[in-house]
Amino acid sequence: MVYSYSEKKRIRKDFGKRPQVLDIPYLLSIQLDSFKKFTDQDPTGERGLEAAFRSVFPIKSFSGNSELQYVSYKLGEPVFDVKECQIRGVTYSAPLRVKLRMVLYDREAAAGTVKDIKEQEVYMGDIPLMTDNGTFVINGTERVIVSQLHRSPGVFFDHDRGKTHSSGKVLYNARIIPYRGSWLDFEFDPKDALFVRIDRRRKLPATIILRALEYSTQEILDLFFERVEFKIKKDTLVMTLVPERLRGETASYDIKDAEGTVLVEAGRRVTARHIRQLEKTNTTELEVPVEYIVGKYAAQDYIDPDTGEVLVSANSEISLEDLAKLSLAGIKELSTLYINELDHGAYISDTLRIDPTTNRLEALVEIYRMMRPGEPPTKDAAEALFQNLFFSEERYDLSKVGRMKFNRRLSIPDDEGSGVLSKEDIVAVMKNIIHIRNGFDEVDDIDHLGNRRIRSVGEMAENQFRVGLVRVERAVRERLSLGDLNELMPQDLINAKPISAAVKEFFGSSQLSQFMDQNNPLSEVTHKRRISALGPGGLTRERAGFEVRDVHPTHYGRLCPIETPEGPNIGLINSLASFARTNSYGFLETPYRKVVDGVITDDVEYLSAIEEGRYVIAQANIEVDSEGRMVEEQIACRHKGESTFMRASDIQYMDVSPQQIISVAASLIPFLEHDDANRALMGANMQRQAVPTLKSEKPLVGTGIERTLAVDSGVVVAAKRGGVIDYVDASRIVVKVNEDELRPGEAGIDIYNLTKYTRSNQNTCINQRPCCSVGEPVVRGDVLADGPSTDLGDLALGQNMRIAFMPWNGYNFEDSILISERVAQEDRFTTIHIQELSCIARDTKLGSEEITADIPNVGESALSKLDESGIVYIGAEVKGGDILVGKVTPKGETQLTPEEKLLRAIFGEKASDVKDSSLRVPNSVKGTIIDVQVFTRDGVEKDKRAIEIEEMHIAQARKDLGEEFKILEEGVLSRARNLLLSAGFTEAQIAALPRKDVLVQVIDDETKQTELEQLAEQHEELKADFDKKFEIKRRKITQGDDLAPGVLKIVKVYLAVKRTIQPGDKMAGRHGNKGVISKINPIEDMPYDEQGNPVDIVLNPLGVPSRMNIGQVLEVHLGAAAKGIGNKIAAMLEDQREKGLAEVRNYIKQVYELGDEVQQRVDIDSFTDDELLRLANNLKGGIPVATPAFDGAKEKEIKQMLELAGLPTSGQLKLFDGRTGNEFERPVTVGYMYMLKLNHLVDDKMHARSTGSYSLVTQQPLGGKAQFGGQRFGEMEVWALEAYGAAYTLQEMLTVKSDDVNGRTQMYKNIVDGNHQMQPGMPESFNVLLKEIRSLGINIELDQE
């Protein structure tokens, strides 16, 4: 493998045995691709905004004299960029402008004669835009739209599993689900009649819908039944024989062949042998006794040819009298319905008998009454209602997916067709459900991923947009009919408000639009790849059963079987598997390698769950020889959702990678294959809660996916093009682009601005740090700067800690964690949290609030950190209760005493009519002010601080753009100098030229002169461009802010809090091994090894066996080896000054070559000495290793690594007690584990109440930290005190400490006076109880005696 310059800085040793056929696809593509389809112009009009417009336009007036047509749309440029939107708290969106054409037709002339056409661009609201990282900025906060897994449109056949009826009979049902429109259900009742429901309303006999579709009784019977033909003879009947129909029947008469030989005697059962005999003798007719016809049903109406009277009506039961009538009327032939109990049930026939309707109109009226009970039906209304239900394109749409699923399920050859239902469609569904009831077909598996599809952002946004457009459509149609159209323009017809409101509602408050989980890069990526079954049009938590939540065979390679939340949402919220993607229909697909004649090829094909069922698919870990042939005879594989063994020649596909079944978060867990699934689930979920530490550290034991994840998440800065690093500082990196990657006429400089100390959604700190230096070559995709939780471009969620598995004085009882003081001293788990506190000055009825340093009754010391505008300085260290922004609010006029009036008159207006409402630091917080933003309403005078901030921003913008300009100008000038050199100028001449004169020299060579002129032109353009950019920036910075009504000014203060690790914080490993820190132990008390090195963390060994997450033990061993190798390299580097690099080179080579059949090849010999030194220096802290899930390091390889590191292969060391110096009685497992600090910090949870607010009704203290509430003293706690007989304590708890209003006030006074006594009174909740009993009409009074 070829490594780039920056990749050579640190190479992770990979233990993977399988070749990487397919790289993990871009992780955010599910979001970005979907939204791109929504916003991009689609000439076919099948998706996105284009489809929404085409589905609603043209809008015709009621009279048909005018219409509004859609021509095209375009999205404008957003006003603010993403960062500005976040600071200002506005939505990152672009204006949507639509070109509409209004066509007026001439009433007098022939139809379709155009009188007038007006075209105009109309503004139709703002469309929120997706950022490059797949998020939306809505009102200044980053949000993610989670994809939804919903039931695909189409037709589904199911049964109730015998739960509906007490008899336990299985009742079948069919359901046609459109993309939009009414649901149509068919269902059997316990008596085997077929019923229909529309939109889950009252059920009707299913034949009503057939009558409404203009089928007569006769046609209905012909659709669903075969006929049995009889010829009427004098005393007997002759039946046309279809031998197969006799199977299983008991003969009620002798069955004879054509020669009269008795084949089956009366009373005997007809078997397959008898049928074969009948077929052999070619018997086509059978004589049956007259009684045989009794109980059969007529297949058609029989009419007396003379009188026209109906002798026997279709579907009526035939008796001997009916037969006699037919015989008399001279009818010689009779058809009956072929029905048998076994596989040709009389379902439709029975249904027709309970059908109250006889013709189409009655059926339509019946449907109308069911849909609109209480309304009087008219013929037109009934027809229109039925027509609109399933046959109108405006009201009903199966969608492309729905039509495809519908046709495939009913074996209709074409995948495409109309979006509405046809008569044939409904009949086909009814035929199929009868087919299933007859036992010829199976019901569908509703949890199969072929029946559930993904609805992503773009599609949901399009649906919401269409909802908005439909609302507008009604208004437009009315205006077209009412207004004077000659005066109106398209703009006057369209009101963009409903569209904006629909889109805003979706992005702002839909259940699937979620506040982005921004704890760390992994949590961002996972959130964007989340697939939820909840949300509008999906399931609800309460109604979702076990089957929906369970892992299904079709989840393989599509949804992760591990990563799902614990709790009520388990199984309803899933994560996309690493390689999965959605196809054009929205179904999940996963890639497989094609296998041809037992040879595995590198061709990769994506298969959906439906297609996968048809093939035989082997797993990725089968043994293969050098030519790609499978070694074993019998191969473990999957076929039709079952796991089985098959011959190698039968295999058609093979998995792409062993990691393809799990999600990104699960594939970050090393040795996942050795962990119990429940613990792996916790491990995957807890990695998302890891807080970025102050100094990120890459995991020693990783899985090799860390880099992909860090780059795809967008938190690191990756090079867009190759080149050389030209300039680096803390906030900017400049790359001089390679000549061959330049676009013509370009300056050849890429500038990357870094994000510094910004607040994330979870109040953690986002900060980017450069990880390259000037002069380094870079290639496209190289990491230039690390973000939060990344280290040299690798995801780094925690820290590598030296761990010992042993009990230690009970401090690691029940998963507690004992850590060394050194961990806290070295700031290993110190995190920075940034809080945003806002102070809003409003216009009140009594006057406007004012932000000022002049606050009544506040001493000088409290104002020491404020400037003259009353706003805190940047860099001030503040603690709980300090004033951050001084603000005064006008008070209502109070009655003044004569004395006060006199004083007022003498000393003028005093500030007694305002009260202090300043922004203060919350109680438990202590930190440093890192930024202040002031937003002022347009037209309100800016204070001094706001102007200062503005000037600072302008100066910063000028500096940024100036430097950018300088760099770009230098690029142009250097190319001009090179040109002059090639034209014969000497270096001295060029050096002597002033900068501005370089571009105005005269060269003899014409082509070079032209080139120089082009460069001069480019320089002028750059200058103009710089001025324009600066002007735009300046205007943006100085313009007033669009604040909410009544708000004059907002001051936002950003406070950085540094949190070191302390007892009570929650920590975890990556294998679901979580615990709370119980004690921070002095270094000298920690157990230490023979070299005197103490351990960092002591974990309880009992946490491993019962939890079955053995992966952590293997990680500790491999981590010890990796660290040991690093120590050896460090020692060799110390010696290399004398011995040279040969020893280091050989040792590193040995390490990378270790392992059987390992795919990774690192050619250490090709490294220059400098590259090798840099690599060795980066490996000093330990060599990072990758052990991919299901393809990781074997026990043998871990032992070889331990040997190479010079450590015992048992992985255990002798340890000594730090307190006594005595050796522990047996060796202890010691090694390195990657530990995470989770975002469950004791500082955010600890809380104590003195006095505070009370509930209005019960007068009891509120609960919870946010309300500064108390602790609940519940009934069990009361029982405990009762059991101890602690009467006074109990009385105190239930009265003065809770809801005895007078008692608690009195007690407060007593304590202040130093009189420690209490007088308990009546608890308020007792009065509430009395009131509640009285509300039931029972008078209850308290006898005070």
Curated annotation (Swiss-Prot):
Highest taxon, organism lineage: Bacteria
GO cellular component: DNA-directed RNA polymerase complex
Keywords: DNA-directed RNA polymerase, Nucleotidyltransferase, Transcription, Transferase
Keyword match Transcription: yes
Disulfides per UniProt: none
GO biological process terms, semicolon-separated: DNA-templated transcription
EC number(s) given by UniProt: 2.7.7.6
Function: DNA-dependent RNA polymerase catalyzes the transcription of DNA into RNA using the four ribonucleoside triphosphates as substrates.
HAMAP family: RNApol_bact_RpoB
Similarity annotation: Belongs to the RNA polymerase beta chain family.
PANTHER family attached to this UniProt entry: DNA-DIRECTED RNA POLYMERASE I SUBUNIT 2 (PTHR20856)
Protein name listed in UniProt: DNA-directed RNA polymerase subunit beta
Gene: rpoB
